[in-house]
Amino acid sequence: MKFLITGGTGLIGNRLSKLLIDNGHSVNILTRKIKNQDNSRLKYFVWNTSKKTIDNKCIDGVDVIVNLAGSSVFSFWTKSNKKMILNSRLDALSTIYGLMQKKKNKVKRIVSASAIGIYPNHKSKVYYENSNEISETFLGNVVYEWEKKAKIFRDIKIDLSIIRIGLVLSKKGGMFEKLLQLNNLGISSIIDSGNQCQSWIHIDDLVNIFLFISVNNINGLVNGVAPNPVSFKELQSNISSNYKKPFLSLSFPKSFLTIPLSLLGLSDFYNDVIGSNKRVSSKKIQDLGYKFIYPSLDKLK
């Protein structure tokens, strides 16, 4: 099969492109700057989503589009950054859609990234793909609009899969990398009670789920999370036991952080990302036959 990956030079895209090539597939990657072609089955093409420009050759012979494009949420949530976080996701989908309308192609499916940020925080509720509740937060709105935009591909008879991604465990990026960096400095931090539920997934499982969905023609929503979520405290404990043991453990009650977070404009970021508390189910992807490499944190040891 031939894949086109948007956001293919990012954390997930890099890992996914390697997996696809290792499994005998060909990969086209859309990027803002052209890169050297170092593999006969890996090609780069230039696009600019804000200007809606794209190299139309990127879609030649492509069977599946994997959409990972979007500005990182791990930034200060200023008004301009919030606008970029939303628009970068919508513009990427619009640019691909525009190309597919104009140029004849053989694309059968688009697998689009999403996030569990669409689900509201809750202490005990378990969220499945058919849950109708939408988080009334900035990130909840971003994910809702992101998924809504992806559904335009159904108008041109393209099968659509949407993966709601949890906290990605990777040493090379995301929140896990930030926690690991603190740990390597000898600091372990617990925010609030530390009991907030973290629905995580190892990056190797995540990219394998993208491949699994693509080759098995699975439509609709899928939660991209591991079967066994953990508390924030358990996540920190795992980092400490598997990596360098910290010499300083800090605990911050939420009330202590409220004013500083507000002054820094980080209240929304805390509620949506750092203080996230949601238990998300992996039952659907397991019932479809996917076997997790890392079903629980203890398997990471």
What are these regions (language model features)?
Residues 94-136:
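Conserved Rossmann-fold NAD(P)-dependent oxidoreductase catalytic core, especially the SDR/UDP-sugar
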Residues 269-301:
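C-terminal amphipathic/interface module of NAD(P)-dependent oxidoreductases
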Residues 3-23:
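N-terminal Rossmann NAD(P)H-binding glycine-rich loop of SDR-like oxidoreductase domains
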Residues 180-188, 196-230, 237:
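Alpha-helical substrate-binding/gating segment
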Residues 215-266:
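Mid/C-terminal beta-alpha module of Rossmann-like enzyme folds, strongest
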Residues 123-162:
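Catalytic helix-loop patch of NAD(P)-dependent Rossmann-fold dehydrogenases
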Residues 152-162, 166-198, 239:
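NAD(P)-dependent short-chain dehydrogenase/reductase
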Residues 43-91:
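NAD(P)H-binding glycine-rich loop region in Rossmannoid oxidoreductase-like domains
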